[in-house]
Structure formats: structure tokens, C-alpha cells
């Protein structure tokens, strides 16, 4: 997707280690960014891959209900600023779509679009699968005052300890090969940490991330992708009005 159409651009794409990649993404027009994220979330072509029957209908109902909620309560077509709610959707969807488009990994919809709605945090935010058929579990975090990589990495490690990756297989089993799901249970999996970032230089940011204890734990897995989204950046041409807005229960 061209920058002029999506309102953001990839400014860094680096290999940290052979199995660890870092992307840095910067919004150039937050109104366009929000619009493109909503449009991306609203694509339902993945549902058409199912050959009719109850699965197609089940996913259609969940998808439409969630999209209606997002478009009515979180991201509106004419929004030109971010809230804490919409920021996490922006981070999740930009990270997910970047990995799909740049690495040609499996296009799996955002977790909230395919999961049965439950109280509390049910698991990972998004998923993909690499060229080796290893499933990747993604988590997005937004913090207004600081780089949020620590929060994202910490949450991933907590979810891993609680075996949320394994429990999430129930939600994505119809979108991934059975063999890949079985490999997750054997420990063969990867993770994606997507997070809001400020103006810290990329070299310093990566250096700090590599010192994080949770990064060290996750780096032992098959693949780790880091996606920094500069939605805390402010200058004369790019004022991102970040407002506090507690997440509403769906």
C-alpha cells in the first residue's frame, strides 16, 4: 500500500539477528492512517476462503459484530487524532499488515475479528505464519509517555507462561495448517512485539531492547519480530493528539 494512501511509511527494516527482525513505522498523516486501518480491518476476503457451511457463517457473524463495534465506538472515518483505544488498534493492524506485505507471511485477521468475545483479555492480539510454517503470536502495546516495548515483551512472556498461545490455537485452527498448530504445542513458534515508540534513535532503541530480560527469553524461539510505531512523535507537521480513553468493554 502506497504511503500517500495509507498515511504511514516504513522508515527502518533491519535484521537484528538471523531470526529477529525490526521494523520502524512512522505515520505521516494520522487521519489517513486511521482511515486505512479501518479499511484494512474491514476487509472480509479471508471469510470467502471457506466453502460455505457453518464456519463461513460463524466467522461472518463475529467479524461483522466486531467491525460494527470498532467503527461505532473506537475508530470513526473522519477521526484525525488518536485515543488510547484507537492507538492499540493502529499498532496491531499496522504491524500485522506490514509483516504480511513485507515478508509475505500468512494473512490472518486481527484476533478480535475471529475470536468469540469473552470478558477480560482472552489472548494475543494478532497472528501470522512464516515461510517455514511456524505460527507467530503478536501483542501490541501503547504507552503515551514512553517506548512501550517493555510492556509488549512482558505481556508476551506472561501469555506464554499462561499458555495463551496454545489456548489461542482453538481460534486460529481453521486458518492455519494442522501441522503448524501441532508444532506450537511442541514449542516451535515465534512472536511479534508491536509497540508505540517515541523519537529515540533506532540504534539506541534496539540496544535497549536487547538488554530487556523478556527479549532475551523470547529470542530463543524460532522467530521474533519487533515493530515500533512512532505514534508518540510530535512536530509542526505531525501533531498526534493522544488522549486518554479507557477501553470500553465489547
Region locations from a protein language model:
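Interdomain/boundary linker segments immediately adjacent to catalytic/signaling cores
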Residues: 1-93
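Charged, structured surface patches that assemble and position nucleic-acid processing machinery
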Residues: 24-29, 35-40, 58, 62-71, ...
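Charged, terminal alpha-helix-loop-beta segments
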Residues: 82, 102-106, 157-163, 238-248
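A short acidic/basic microdomain associated with nuclease active sites
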Residues: 98-119
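Short acidic loop-to-beta-strand element that houses the catalytic metal-binding Asp/Glu
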Residues: 122-129
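Conserved catalytic cores of phosphodiester-cleaving nucleases, focusing on short active-site segments
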Residues: 126, 136-142
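Glycine-centered tight beta-turn/hairpin loop motif at sheet-sheet or coil-to-beta transitions
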Residues: 131-133
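Catalytic cores of nucleic-acid endonucleases
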Residues: 141-203
Amino acid at each position: 500500500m502506497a504511503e500517500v494512501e495509507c498515511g504511514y511509511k516504513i522508515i527502518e527494516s533491519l535484521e537484528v539477528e538471523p531470526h529477529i527482525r525490526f521494523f520502524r513505522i512512522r505515520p505521516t498523516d494520522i487521519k489517513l492512517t486511521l482511515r486505512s486501518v479501518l479499511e484494512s480491518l474491514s476487509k472480509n476476503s479471508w471469510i470467502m476462503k471457506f466453502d460455505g457451511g457453518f464456519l463461513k457463517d460463524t466467522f461472518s457473524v463475529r467479524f461483522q459484530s466486531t467491525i460494527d463495534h470498532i467503527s461505532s465506538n473506537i475508530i470513526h472515518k473522519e477521526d484525525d487524532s488518536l485515543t488510547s483505544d484507537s492507538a492499540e488498534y493502529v499498532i496491531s493492524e499496522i504491524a500485522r499488515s506490514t509483516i504480511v506485505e513485507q515478508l509475505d507471511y500468512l494473512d490472518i485477521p486481527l484476533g478480535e475479528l475471529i475470536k468469540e468475545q469473552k470478558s477480560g483479555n482472552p489472548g494475543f492480539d494478532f497472528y501470522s505464519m512464516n515461510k517455514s510454517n511456524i505460527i507467530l503470536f503478536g501483542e501490541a502495546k501503547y504507552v503515551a509517555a514512553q517506548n512501550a516495548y517493555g510492556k509488549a515483551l512482558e505481556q508476551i512472556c506472561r501469555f506464554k507462561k499462561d499458555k495463551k498461545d496454545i489456548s489461542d490455537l482453538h481460534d486460529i485452527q481453521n486458518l492455519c495448517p494442522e501441522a503448524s498448530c501441532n508444532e506450537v504445542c511442541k514449542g516451535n513458534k515465534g512472536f511479534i512485539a508491536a509497540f508505540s515508540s517515541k523519537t529515540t534513535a533506532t540504534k539506541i532503541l534496539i540496544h535497549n531492547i536487547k538488554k530487556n530480560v523478556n527479549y532475551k527469553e523470547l529470542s530463543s524461539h524460532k522467530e521474533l519480530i519487533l515493530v515500533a510505531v512512532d505514534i508518540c512523535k510530535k512536530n509542526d507537521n505531525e501533531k498526534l493528539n493522544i488522549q486518554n480513553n479507557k477501553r470500553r468493554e465489547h
